[in-house]
Every structure is written in structure tokens, then in C-alpha cells.
């Protein structure tokens, strides 16, 4: 029997109850596209991932709690910031480091897109209501004043798209979707502020907020601010999952022993150190 591409997924974390949770929509979208989802545990022991990562052909970083502002050099001054999930954040940083090093396909959804940007050195608006509208009114978006303000946390059911995004036609995402404008759902109060120097913005909301990013010089490392898993089976956006699985299948066939590594993790040193130091040593 042909082996299905395995997609590692990070669960949501409830630090108070010491629980993880996982919406089945993500797994359903991966299965429908022809992949096999694998829910990853949250562990501070890197040897767990030395065993698991060689089995994995691609990753999905899902939605969830806000990222700790300290990870991108900001202060924790907003009462609107969710509970932080340090174990999850450090697993996602490990995954991104691994996928970046070995060019494994990875898709970030909502918070997952924000995590790609943060892990690669970008920053976030900690709360769009407090920060982003004022920035728009000052005209930082290509010098345009008076851009429309959107409800980025929609009141309608999440299975209903509520606002348009414009996609750069020459981007990977634009070529996948085959359209320049598409309607999406929206359920977030944070967003990309300063882009990582290794990331390109490839889609925007009408108010100028970044809605999709791609990591430069990587085969398939894409983030979207919306939730395409709500549209599986009835929307053009499911082709993004199809493309992820296709890229993962190619990686499984052609990447050989890229995953056989020893992972070394050391604690951050110094006040400016925002992430643990991760190194990968090839097994011989």
C-alpha cells in the first residue's frame, strides 16, 4: 500500500488545565487532500522530536492563543492578550527551524501565520483595535488615508466568508488559487506588523492588513491569516491543502534521510534572547 504523506500538527494548549485540544477540521482537511495527520505532543525533551520528525513530510501550524509579545521584543502591556503558551511556542519554533533547515513544506493558519513571521524576526500588532486603525489613519499603507476598517473578528459563523483579500498574482498562493480577489473568513484580533526580512507579504485585506505571507527561497512555506479548513469540500481554498500534501509527497519521495538528526536545545542567554538556541547535527 502506498504510504500517505504525514503532516505534523501542533495542538492548542490550555496551561491552566494542563490539557491540549485539537479541532478536527484540520485533520479532516488533510485527510481529504490525501495526507495522514499526526498530532504532536508538547514536550521540552528534544529527543521526542528526533524520533517523530523523520516520520513527518510537512507541518501545519494552527490557530490558537496569542503569541507572547516578549517573543518579538514587545512588552506585555495589553489586557487583551490571551494566556501565553510557552511550551507550544517553543515547539513551533523548533518545527519552523527544522522545516526551514530541511525545506519541508509548512502551512501556517491564522496564529500559525503570525508565528512564521515572529519566529523569523517579524513583529505583530498586539491588538488591532488599539493599534492598527490608528496606523491606517496615519496613512502608512502606501500613503493612503481613509482606508476602510474591517471587523477582523467576524460576528457571522466562521464557515461564511465575510471580507475580501487581494492576492499578488505572481505569488505561490496566487498561482494556486488562480484568482486575484477572494472572500475569506476572519477570527483574529492580532496581525502582522513588521515583516521578517525573510518573508514576503502576498495578500492584503482592503484596510491594508497583511493576510498571507510566503517565506523566500523555500519550496512551500506559506501562511494565511484566515481559516481555510472551514471550507473543505466546498470552496476554492481547499486547493491550498492539496498543494501542501503534494509538496509533502514530493518531499517524502526525494528528500531521503534529511530528517535523521540530533536536536540540541539550549536556553536563551541574555535579555535580548527571545528563543532557545536550536542546532541540528546530521546523523552518520
Task: Kindly give the residue locations of the regions a language model identified.
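N-terminal beta1-alpha1 cap of cysteine-dependent amidohydrolase-like domains
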Residues: 1-109, 118-125, 129-183, 189, ...
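Active-site-proximal beta-strand elements of phosphoester/diester hydrolases
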Residues: 222-225
Amino acid at each position: 500500500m502506498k504510504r500517505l504523506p504525514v503532516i505534523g500538527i501542533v495542538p492548542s494548549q490550555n496551561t491552566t488545565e494542563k490539557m491540549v485540544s485539537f479541532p478536527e477540521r484540520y485533520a479532516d482537511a488533510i485527510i481529504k487532500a490525501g495526507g495522514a495527520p499526526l498530532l504532536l505532543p508538547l514536550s521540552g525533551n528534544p529527543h521526542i522530536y528526533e524520533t517523530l520528525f523523520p516520520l513527518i513530510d510537512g507541518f501545519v501550524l494552527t490557530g490558537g492563543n496569542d503569541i507572547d509579545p516578549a517573543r518579538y521584543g514587545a512588552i506585555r502591556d495589553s489586557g487583551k492578550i490571551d494566556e501565553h503558551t510557552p511550551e507550544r511556542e517553543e515547539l513551533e519554533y523548533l518545527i519552523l527551524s527544522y522545516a526551514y533547515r530541511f525545506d519541508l513544506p509548512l502551512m501556517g493558519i491564522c496564529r500559525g501565520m503570525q508565528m512564521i513571521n515572529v519566529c523569523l524576526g517579524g513583529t505583530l500588532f498586539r491588538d488591532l483595535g488599539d493599534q492598527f486603525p490608528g496606523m491606517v489613519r496615519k496613512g502608512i499603507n502606501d500613503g493612503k488615508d481613509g482606508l476602510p476598517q474591517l471587523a477582523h473578528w467576524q460576528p457571522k459563523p466562521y464557515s461564511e466568508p465575510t471580507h475580501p483579500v487581494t492576492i499578488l498574482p505572481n505569488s505561490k498562493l496566487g498561482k494556486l488559487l488562480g484568482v486575484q480577489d477572494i472572500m475569506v473568513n476572519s477570527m483574529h484580533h492580532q496581525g502582522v506588523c513588521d515583516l521578517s526580512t525573510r518573508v514576503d507579504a502576498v495578500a492584503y485585506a482592503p484596510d491594508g492588513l497583511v493576510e498571507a505571507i510566503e517565506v523566500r527561497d523555500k519550496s512551500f512555506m506559506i501562511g494565511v491569516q484566515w481559516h481555510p479548513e472551514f471550507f473543505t469540500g466546498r470552496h476554492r481554498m481547499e486547493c491550498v491543502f492539496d498543494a501542501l500534501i503534494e509538496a509533502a509527497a514530493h518531499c517524502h519521495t526525494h528528500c531521503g534521510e534529511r530528517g535523521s538528526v540530533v536536536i540540541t536545545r539550549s536556553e536563551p542567554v541574555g535579555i535580548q534572547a527571545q528563543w532557545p538556541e536550536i542546532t541540528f547535527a546530521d546523523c552518520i
